[in-house]
């Protein structure tokens, strides 16, 4: 899935767009995703992360976060 955070696992949500007249139409609430590079074990990896994922990495560190998720760094992303 292309619109998926690789850290938190969040994906787009479905909901209703409500007008002033209370008419409801379906819409998608997309994530605030960005491609971000991180330096781990003498090399750069590219992750697609949401803003919540970036906050998690800033709080705990990239290595501890990836270890908690059993993320394989050897694969190319």
From Swiss-Prot:
The keyword DNA repair does not apply. The keyword Ribonucleoprotein applies. GO terms for cellular component: ribonucleoprotein complex; ribosome. Keywords: Ribonucleoprotein, Ribosomal protein. SUPFAM superfamilies: L28p-like. One of its GO terms (molecular function) is structural constituent of ribosome. It comes from the Bacteria. PANTHER family: 50S RIBOSOMAL PROTEIN L28, LARGE RIBOSOMAL SUBUNIT PROTEIN BL28A. Belongs to the bacterial ribosomal protein bL28 family. This is Large ribosomal subunit protein bL28. It comes from Karelsulcia muelleri (strain GWSS) (Sulcia muelleri).
